[in-house]
Amino acid sequence: MTRHIILDCDPGHDDAIALILALAHPDLVPLAVTTSAGNQTPDKTLNNALRILTLLNRGDIPVAGGATKPLTRELIIADNVHGETGLDGPALPEPSFSPQAITAVELMAQQIRQSTQPVTLVPTGPLTNIALLLASHSELHPKIERIVLMGGAAGVGNWTPAAEFNIFVDPEAADIVFKSGIPITMCGLDVTHQAQIMDEDIERIRAIPNPIAQCVAELLDFFMIYHRDPKWGFIGAPLHDPCTIAWLLKPELFEAQDCWVGIETQSELTLGMTVVDRYQLTGKTANATVLFGLDRLGFVDLLVDSLRVYDPTYLNRR
């Protein structure tokens, strides 16, 4: 069964790899790619999405840029992780096509309205665009099957001691999304920190004789630099955003629990924290399926097998 998806991203190395993973599988039908500010400034994340789709020869997918800043706050970017371009490392082509002359919210609404089946939203950056869509198009809520997002943590954060980056950038947007009543799958740091790519995994990818695999290997080479800092305690580099796509393709790779999740929007110390009620202490109804465990080897195999799809037949088919 095919699933219609809209990818809302802020590329970003792991966003780019999530996009590459998704487009290798015909069961996932990409209706649109929209972008937000986050890993880099909004102009760079939009350009990066266009560059990746150009690399994949997928100029048929409509692309639109979204919000240039959070709902109520100043923008924070993660250029210390992703470099000056947001996709430092490989030599990527310049875009061969242009974005739509409408906003991300307008493109998402258009595609959801026209879709013949419910649509799954896959945001892998701050949730600003998704919040704006939900707030301005309540009539479309019934056509949104699920929101599969990368963000949050039941445990410690990675941008502050309490908060994961995507939620911290726009906690008010996250609050709207988690209160929407739409089914949510939360791929937070608890699971994405288990999705580490090791040096030997990168070499498996580099051994695949196609340009997309080579690009991913070079993305990972750069991504590893930041994550080698001993403070993280990582052996490899965590591939946060591809966990969303992996869950859509192979949910059996993950351990999950339905929980109530609230967003802290006020505290000076814990702003952006995702408060995950794992032990049902609040008595509130669960509003998210939270991922906690991962078969790492199965995850890596899925990525490697998916990259083998990008042979000349695929890349020249359009």
From Swiss-Prot:
One of its GO terms (cellular component) is cytosol. Keywords: Glycosidase, Hydrolase. GO terms for biological process: nucleobase-containing small molecule interconversion; purine nucleoside catabolic process; pyrimidine nucleobase metabolic process. The keyword Manganese does not apply. The keyword Hydrolase applies. The active site is at 240. Its EC number is 3.2.-.-. It comes from the Bacteria. GO terms for molecular function: purine nucleosidase activity; uridine nucleosidase activity. InterPro entries: I/U_nuclsd_hydro_CS, Inosine/uridine_hydrolase_dom, IUNH, Pyrim_hydro_RihA, Ribo_hydro-like. It is an enzyme of class 3 (hydrolase). Belongs to the IUNH family. RihA subfamily. Hydrolyzes cytidine or uridine to ribose and cytosine or uracil, respectively. This is Pyrimidine-specific ribonucleoside hydrolase RihA. It comes from Shewanella baltica (strain OS155 / ATCC BAA-1091).
